[in-house]
Swiss-Prot record:
Residues at the active site: 160
Family the entry assigns: Belongs to the class I-like SAM-binding methyltransferase superfamily. RNA methyltransferase RlmE family.
Keywords, alphabetical: Cytoplasm, Methyltransferase, rRNA processing, S-adenosyl-L-methionine, Transferase
Gene expressing this chain: rlmE
InterPro entries documented for this protein: RNA_methyltr_RlmE (IPR050082), RNA_MeTrfase_FtsJ_dom (IPR002877), rRNA-MeTfrase_E (IPR015507), SAM-dependent_MTases_sf (IPR029063)
Pfam families for the chain: FtsJ (PF01728)
Enzyme class: transferase
Protein name: Ribosomal RNA large subunit methyltransferase E
EC code(s) of this entry: 2.1.1.166
Species of origin: Tremblaya princeps
Methyltransferase recorded as keyword: yes
PANTHER family xrefs: RIBOSOMAL RNA METHYLTRANSFERASE, RRNA METHYLTRANSFERASE 2, MITOCHONDRIAL
Keyword Iron-sulfur attributed: no
Amino acid sequence: MGRTSEWYARHVGDSFVRTSKAWGYRARAACKLKRLDAKYGLMSRQCDVLELGSSPGVWSQYISYERRVSGMAWRTVSVDTRAMVRVRGVSFIHGDITEAETMAEVSSRLPSGVGLILSDICPHPSCERYLDSIATAKVAETLLMVSRRFLLDGGALLHKTFVIRAEHIASVMERHFSSVEVYRDASSRSFNSEAYLLCVGD
């Protein structure tokens, strides 16, 4: 069996993939966010939400559904350099969050800031440790820049990363947030080694 065939066999047999499709979500990432939401009460926050790296829109779908079910009218703005199919109740910005024009557009749609930032700006690890360190530092810098600009006091930032990068990013965030927790759940396959950082401000 070739590498692609092996991946496909794992993919279709994955219980999280089956569950996500049964719920009508675009990918298995919905299951991961649902677990994190159950653990940390993310969607129970009475606040606007900013989502970074939103394409293909799985987290946006989950946010939209949970907000509709709860009757919340808070705004959700998602940003990505890649195009994304429209999600009901979510305002999408096709742009780079590190660019001034995109930041200005986010500000115009979320003038009062947000209480929750969800981030999936997570480039895959490089086999070159030096290059990977640079990429990790850039991600941490971007998260801090966006948090300082938009995150309200007491707000939370949830960032998806890889285990190999989690400690580095957490060490940076701990200097700027009152609490930082690293979480990894059963829906992260071992060869992916995904981890999630929950950073909460004062």
